[in-house]
C-alpha cells in the first residue's frame, strides 16, 4: 500500500514537473518572439536615427537637405500610419453612436484634426532635430513642441464633438497620444 502511494505521489510530482517545463517553454518562446520583434523595431529606429544624425551634421551641407527631407517623409508616414487605424476605428464605431451626435461631418473634422497635428508635429519636430547639432536642447524642444501639437489637437477636437461622442472618442484619442509619445520616446 505504501509503495503504491509513493508511486502515485511520484507520478503526480513528475506530471507537475512536466507541466511546469512545458509552461516555461511556452513562456520562453513568447519571450523570444517579443524580443525578436523589439530588436527589429530597435534596428529600424537605429537606422532612422542614423539618418537624422546624418541630416543634422553641420559639416555635410550638401547631403543635409535631401537626408532631412527623407527623415521628414519617414516621420510623416509613421504618424499617418498610427493615425489611419485610429480614424478607421472611429468610423467603424459610428453605428454605436446616435447619427446626430456623431455624423459624417464629425468624422471629417476628426480626420482633419489628425492631419493638422501630423503637419504641425512634423514641421516642429524636424526643425528641432535639424537645429540639434547647434542646440543641445533641440530634441527636448522637439518633444515639447510635439506635445503642444497633440494637446492642441485633443483640445480642439473635443471642443467640436458632442458630449456622448467625446466619451466614446476619448479612448481612441488617449491611445493616439500614448502611441505618439512612445514614438517620440523611441526616437529621442
Predicted regions and their residues:
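Domain-level marker for long, solvent-exposed, non-transmembrane regions
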Residues: 17-188
Amino acid at each position: 500500500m505504501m509503495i503504491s502511494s509513493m508511486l502515485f505521489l511520484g507520478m503526480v510530482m513528475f506530471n507537475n514537473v512536466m507541466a511546469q517545463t512545458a509552461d516555461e517553454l511556452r513562456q520562453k518562446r513568447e519571450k523570444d518572439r517579443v524580443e525578436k520583434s523589439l530588436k527589429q523595431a530597435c534596428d529600424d529606429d537605429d537606422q532612422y536615427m542614423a539618418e537624422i544624425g546624418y541630416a543634422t551634421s553641420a559639416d555635410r551641407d550638401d547631403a543635409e537637405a535631401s537626408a532631412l527631407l527623407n527623415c521628414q517623409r519617414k516621420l510623416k508616414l509613421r504618424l499617418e500610419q498610427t493615425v489611419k487605424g485610429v480614424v478607421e476605428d472611429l468610423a467603424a464605431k459610428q453605428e454605436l453612436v446616435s447619427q446626430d451626435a456623431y455624423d459624417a461631418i464629425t468624422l471629417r473634422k476628426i480626420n482633419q484634426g489628425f492631419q493638422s497635428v501630423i503637419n504641425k508635429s512634423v514641421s516642429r519636430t524636424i526643425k528641432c532635430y535639424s537645429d540639434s547639432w547647434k542646440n543641445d536642447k533641440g530634441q527636448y524642444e522637439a518633444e515639447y513642441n510635439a506635445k503642444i501639437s497633440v494637446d492642441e489637437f485633443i483640445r480642439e477636437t473635443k471642443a467640436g464633438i458632442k458630449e456622448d461622442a467625446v466619451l466614446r472618442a476619448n479612448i481612441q484619442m488617449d491611445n493616439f497620444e500614448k502611441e505618439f509619445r512612445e514614438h517620440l520616446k523611441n526616437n529621442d
